[in-house]
């Protein structure tokens, strides 16, 4: 089967066009199905939920052994225990208990979703290919300056091997994240307005996402 390709410009860190590259449309320009993206984002966010909310039932609340007052003759409503959910300080009916919110989607759906998220950014014109991105030292100011030159106010940068210098340089600059190819996910793609692919990572992504 013949591959259909789209051609995009490759720029350097001075925002100058230095080359062109072909992207496989099966990965970077496919039909975007929002319900699949929604399911995968929901899966990712559910996996991060702590699930630690907990309340006590009437059995677990302290006290309540003795009947508060006799059944008849007081003029008050009958009561059997101070731990009743009707009482202030009593137990909670059907309250939350610690639980695992995570659920799984099959691998093929997850791969398709990453490809669709990349395609969405490509179709918007928000997918940028950078020839290389190297920093010799940890310099936040230099990183911020490069982002300004590239006209990127909010971006996810995907690299084959993110250097420690680069990762630490962007840490204190709001709106940016650097991920290795294997860490690329739907939530982070959709969270950022632009996606920057450093050129060598494209081959890795094509191998990973061809399903």
Curated annotation (Swiss-Prot):
Q: Which UniProt keywords apply?
A: Ribonucleoprotein, Ribosomal protein, RNA-binding, rRNA-binding
InterPro entries xref list: Ribosomal_uL4 (IPR002136), Ribosomal_uL4-like (IPR013005), Ribosomal_uL4_dom_sf (IPR023574)
Question: Residue ranges of region Disordered?
Answer: 48-89
Alphabetical list of Gene3D superfamilies matching this protein: 3.40.1370.10
List the Pfam families.
Ribosomal_L4
GO BP annotation list: translation
In alphabetical order, the GO MF annotations are: rRNA binding; structural constituent of ribosome
Residue stretches spanning the membrane = none
What GO cellular component entries does it have?
Answer: ribonucleoprotein complex; ribosome
How the protein assembles, per its UniProt entry?
Part of the 50S ribosomal subunit.
- Family in the record: Belongs to the universal ribosomal protein uL4 family.
Cross-referenced HAMAP family: Ribosomal_uL4_B
Q: What does this protein do?
A: One of the primary rRNA binding proteins, this protein initially binds near the 5'-end of the 23S rRNA. It is important during the early stages of 50S assembly. It makes multiple contacts with different domains of the 23S rRNA in the assembled 50S subunit and ribosome.
Q: Can you say what this protein is called?
A: Large ribosomal subunit protein uL4
Organism this protein belongs to = Desulfotalea psychrophila (strain LSv54 / DSM 12343)
Give the gene name. Answer: rplD
């Amino acid at each position: 089967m013949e591959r259909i390709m789209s051609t995009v410009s490759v720029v350097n860190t001075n925002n100058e066009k230095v080359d062109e590259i072909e992207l496989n449309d099966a990965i970077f320009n496919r039909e975007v199905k929002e319900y699949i993206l929604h399911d995968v984002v929901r899966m990712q966010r559910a996996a991060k939920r702590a699930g630690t909310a907990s309340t006590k039932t009437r059995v677990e609340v302290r006290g309540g052994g003795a009947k508060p007052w006799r059944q008849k003759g007081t003029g008050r409503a009958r009561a059997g225990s101070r731990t009743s959910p009707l009482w202030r300080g009593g137990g909670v009916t059907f309250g939350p208990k610690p639980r695992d919110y995570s659920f799984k989607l099959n691998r093929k759906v997850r791969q398709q979703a990453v490809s669709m998220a990349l395609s969405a950014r490509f179709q918007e014109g928000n997918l940028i290919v950078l020839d290389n991105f190297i920093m010799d030292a940890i310099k936040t100011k230099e990183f911020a300056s490069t982002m300004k030159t590239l006209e990127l106010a909010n971006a996810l940068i995907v690299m084959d091997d993110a250097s420690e210098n680069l990762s630490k340089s962007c840490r204190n600059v709001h709106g940016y994240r650097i991920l290795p190819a294997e860490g690329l996910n739907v939530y982070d793609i959709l969270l950022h307005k632009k996606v920057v692919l450093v050129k060598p990572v494209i081959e890795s992504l094509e191998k990973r996402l061809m399903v």
